[in-house]
Amino acid sequence: MAEFVRAQIFGTTFEITSRYTDLQLVGMGAFGLVCSAKDQLTNQAVAVKKIMKPFSTPVLSKRTYRELKLLKHLRHENIISLSDIFISPLEDIYFVTELLGTDLHRLLTSRPLEKQFIQYFLYQILRGLKYVHSAGVVHRDLKPSNILVNENCDLKICDFGLARIQDPQMTGYVSTRYYRAPEIMLTWQKYDVEVDIWSAGCIFAEMLEGKPLFPGKDHVNQFSIITELLGTPPDDVIQTICSENTLRFVQSLPKRERQPLANKFKNAEPDAVDLLENMLVFDPRKRVRAEQALAHAYLAPYHDPTDEPVADEKFDWSFNDADLPVDTWKIMMYSEILDYHNVDAAVQEQENGS
């Protein structure tokens, strides 16, 4: 039985196994706190994320279960990886992952990025997305603060709490507004992996310019700003809008022509602008896919089709439509955690034996 120790962090009790020491607060979110810590077993610095009250409601239980399942399933160099998970005696859940020194949001607010860093960061984002999308997963909340970077410029996408299955009837308010794809704002119904490409395009533009491309004050203003640059959506895109109110709003906007992005990004090279043009397309069906974007001339210095892996198997979303009580989610969560530790122990045994 693991020994647990308690520490007070920012008024919150962290109840963690004695394996982790030197806790320091590094981030706060709506659903949890993240601390850095030292792993006594490996001597490595790690991030410990406490999920607040994971069993307080069925919705929170399901959200936590989904994030746990995704972290277990997604194994890729550009995706944050799980190194430990446990439930404390107080029934809080803790995810332990590798610790990266900073995130893209902090980098972008501290100084302009040089061209080779922009290229390398975008390459790694798209490499991670190619893998995630091949697993049948849409991140849905891609933004600079969810993209972690270390001192070697290795990049990892994190925070899969909002991630969803590709396709049927996806729901509206999800990602941070500046990076939200127009089809999420317009249809509030069906969308797919292309929403992540739009978000990556917004992040790419921000790396080039040093400031957000579409800093909307609200949804109406956000959409208006997008049309000022990209023009009015094509009629066949407008026809996909499900909400009558949204349809009326879009039809009431003045007709606008798409502006050449080269005029907006005067200091960017033509290849960068061309890739951005292919990422920021109103019609998701015509938006470039991660795999295609990786092969674009702008990313030629890093592109290696033999080292851009896809998932071995699709993620199992069968639980996602389940409407279950908290106790059932709890049993399922315990089962997943036991499975994680059993598999982990088997892998270590195999490595030690080889």
From Swiss-Prot:
Pfam families: Pkinase. It catalyses: L-seryl-[protein] + ATP = O-phospho-L-seryl-[protein] + ADP + H(+); L-threonyl-[protein] + ATP = O-phospho-L-threonyl-[protein] + ADP + H(+). Transmembrane segments: none annotated. The keyword Transferase applies. Its EC number is 2.7.11.24. A motif (TXY) lies at residues 171-173. The modification Phosphothreonine is found at T171. The modification Phosphotyrosine is found at Y173. Its main location: cytoplasm. Dually phosphorylated on Thr-171 and Tyr-173, which activates the enzyme. SMART domains: S_TKc. ATP binds at V26, G27, M28, G29, A30, F31, G32, L33, V34, K49. GO terms for cellular component: cytoplasm; nucleus. It comes from the Eukaryota. GO terms for molecular function: ATP binding; MAP kinase activity; protein serine kinase activity. The active site is at D141. It is found in: Cytoplasm; Nucleus. Residues 20-299 form the Protein kinase domain. Activated by tyrosine and threonine phosphorylation. One of its GO terms (biological process) is stress-activated MAPK cascade. Keywords: Activator, ATP-binding, Cytoplasm, Kinase, Nucleotide-binding, Nucleus, Phosphoprotein, Serine/threonine-protein kinase, Transcription, Transcription regulation, Transferase. Proline-directed serine/threonine-protein kinase involved in a signal transduction pathway that is activated by changes in the osmolarity of the extracellular environment. Controls osmotic regulation of transcription of target genes. Belongs to the protein kinase superfamily. Ser/Thr protein kinase family. MAP kinase subfamily. HOG1 sub-subfamily. The TXY motif contains the threonine and tyrosine residues whose phosphorylation activates the MAP kinases. This is Mitogen-activated protein kinase HOG1. The lineage of its organism: Eukaryota, Fungi, Dikarya, Ascomycota, Pezizomycotina.
